[in-house]
Each structure stands twice: as structure tokens, then as C-alpha cells.
UniProtKB/Swiss-Prot annotation:
InterPro entries: AB_hydrolase_1 (IPR000073), AB_hydrolase_fold (IPR029058). Keywords: Cell membrane, Membrane, Transmembrane, Transmembrane helix. Its main location: membrane. It is a single-pass membrane protein. The keyword Isomerase does not apply. The keyword Cell membrane applies. Coiled coil: none annotated. Gene3D superfamilies: alpha/beta hydrolase. The chain crosses the membrane at residues 10-30. It comes from Bacillus subtilis (strain 168). The gene is ybdG. Residues 94-166 form the AB hydrolase-1 domain. It is found in: Cell membrane. This is Uncharacterized protein YbdG.
């Protein structure tokens, strides 16, 4: 028996030493690569100080309306990933892409990502970069919480919301992260902080961005570099862990019924008849019913719909804005 325990102890210590050695090696390699890639990160936008932290806002175009593009969770380089869409809007309008804390060229804030903090940072970044309200918000995924909360707290600042396959505030409340999911989020952050994500690039950035041609070859390399640097950092981790509390804050306020809302529902062919797609459509319909002016349009494609249907999104958005003006 003593011999067995001795063998098990040796095996355990050996495995622990191997894991430590691999982790240290990956960490060193990751930071070596970060130092090499730093030369690529020359900036894209206007960097402003928000509560002692640097935040980046990219803007282009001119016109009466300002469309604010708000990325989903983990979209580490939104000014690059969403270029294929916002470049269509900027031909006749002003656009702004806000890098939330921990995204793009913005610094990691290391706060708990409470929705009030997130919203005030976004508002200050826009104002300090010369983008004054009212805005037409273009949220994607988890940014749906911030967009709706913004319209609830500052309705005069929001001209309309064009929601790209967003997560509704009440969905983050109804489908609260389980204890196991929260452990997965924390574990994933730990692995990425060491640098293991380097070995699964398809999980770090969207290969579709590289496949398409709206970025130059140089921009594609910058896009990759930002993703490797920022992917699933502390702010992105806390953003997910805080989603239930943030959704609850919005749910507990009256719906901003005067705000015109266009919901773009991304539905892929293979998931069209799935329980998720059917329930999501019902959720969207119930949500839209709370507004004086609201419409839902179904688009063929997966969640990152701005990559697959940019022309259709632009067309539907312009039609909707002409209708509500």
C-alpha cells in the first residue's frame, strides 16, 4: 500500500511539474510574441482619458446622423472586425466605434464591469472624442444590454437602436450563467492570461474576417495582433460574469417605448427550426411589443451577422431611419 501511494505521489508531482513547465514555456512564448506584435499596433482612432484610463474611439465619415457601433462580447478588435459594415454607413453618415475597456486600443480597466460604469465610460469617450448626441446605436450581442439601458437612462441621447442579433436584457436574466458556466469563464480567462489561446487562433479571432477582403493584408495582421493581446482579458471575463446583474438593472426599469427599435434576427439555415431560434424569435416579438415603433427583420446568417449581410443591414437600417424621421 505504501508503495502504491509512493508511486501515485511521484506521478502527481511529475504531472504537476510538467504542467508548470508547459505553462511557463507558453507564457514566455506568448509575451515574446506580444513584444514582436507591438510594432503593429500603431493605433486607429482617437485615444481619450476616461476616469484615468485610456479609451479609443474610431470615427469616420460625416453627416447629420452618428451611428455608434457597439461590439459583442469578446470581439477584441471591433474597429477592424466591423469595418465591412460601418464603411457602408460612413459614405453618407458619421460613424463611431467605441473600444470598450479591454477592447481594441483601450486599456483594461480591471473593474467589475457594472453596466453603469460601462455606459458612463462609453458616453464620456464619445463626448471627449467630439461625438455629441443624439446617436443611432448599432449594438451586437451582449451590447444589447448597454444600448437598452442607455435609452432607458438617457432617452434624449438616442435617436434609434438598430439591434444586430442582440441578447435582450431579460434573456441574460432568464438564462443566468450557472455555477459551472462561471467556473468555465474564470478558467478560460486563466488559460488566456497564460497564453494558451495562441494555439487555437480560430477561437481567438473570426476566420471569416481574414477570408473576406474588406481589410488590407496589413490590417489583417493588426487584427490578429490585437486579438492575441486582448482576448478574454479581465474586462471581458467580468463582462460575462456581470451579465445577470447588468440585465437585471435594465429589466427593472420601464422600457424606453419612445425609442424606435429595429431588431435584426440572424437565423442560419441549419438552425432555423431549432428550439433556440424559435424561442429567440418569441422573445424578440414580446420585447418589440413594448415600443411605439419597432420592427423585426430576419437575416440569413450566423450570429456575427455584420460579416455576412452588411449590404442588407445597411439597406434595412436606412429604410427604417427614413420611416421614423
Amino acid at each position: 500500500m505504501k508503495t502504491l501511494w509512493k508511486v501515485l505521489k511521484i506521478v502527481f508531482v511529475s504531472l504537476a511539474a510538467l504542467v508548470l513547465l508547459v505553462s511557463v514555456s507558453v507564457f514566455i512564448y506568448h509575451h515574446f510574441q506580444l513584444n514582436k506584435e507591438a510594432a503593429l499596433l500603431k493605433g486607429k482612432g482617437t485615444v481619450v482619458d476616461v476616469d484615468g484610463k485610456k479609451m479609443n474611439v474610431y470615427q469616420e465619415g460625416s453627416g447629420k446622423d452618428t451611428f455608434v457601433f457597439m461590439s459583442g462580447s469578446g470581439i477584441a478588435a471591433p474597429a477592424y472586425e466591423m469595418k465591412g459594415l460601418y464603411s457602408k454607413f460612413s459614405k453618407e453618415n458619421k460613424i463611431a466605434v467605441v473600444d470598450r475597456a479591454g477592447y481594441g486600443y483601450s486599456e483594461v480597466s480591471h473593474d467589475d464591469r457594472d453596466i453603469d460604469t460601462v455606459l458612463e465610460q462609453t458616453r464620456k469617450a464619445l463626448m471627449k472624442s467630439g461625438n455629441k448626441p443624439p446617436y443611432i446605436l448599432m449594438p451586437h450581442s451582449i451590447s444589447g444590454i448597454e444600448a437598452m439601458y442607455w435609452a432607458q437612462k438617457y432617452p434624449k441621447e438616442i435617436k434609434a437602436i438598430i439591434a444586430m442579433d442582440i441578447g435582450l436584457p431579460q434573456q441574460y436574466v432568464t438564462y443566468k450563467l450557472s455555477g459551472v458556466d462561471r467556473l468555465k469563464v474564470r478558467g478560460f480567462h486563466l488559460l488566456t492570461s497564460i497564453g494558451f489561446h495562441r494555439f487555437i487562433p480560430s477561437a481567438v479571432y473570426n476566420p471569416e474576417v481574414i477570408r473576406q477582403s474588406f481589410l488590407t493584408d496589413e490590417e489583417k495582421e493588426i487584427y490578429k495582433a490585437i486579438n492575441f493581446k486582448q482576448f478574454f482579458n479581465a474586462d471581458m471575463e467580468h463582462e460575462l460574469l456581470q451579465s445577470y446583474q447588468n440585465g437585471s438593472k435594465s429589466v427593472n426599469l420601464p422600457a424606453p417605448k419612445e425609442t424606435p427599435v429595429l431588431i435584426l434576427d440572424a437565423v442560419s439555415d441549419q438552425n432555423r427550426h431549432s428550439k433556440y431560434a424559435i424561442q429567440n424569435r418569441k422573445d424578440y416579438e414580446a420585447f418589440a411589443a413594448q415600443f411605439n415603433t419597432a420592427d423585426i427583420k430576419e437575416l440569413r446568417g450566423t450570429h456575427s451577422i455584420y460579416l455576412y449581410q452588411p449590404d442588407q443591414i445597411y439597406k434595412l437600417s436606412m429604410e427604417f431611419m427614413r420611416k421614423v424621421r
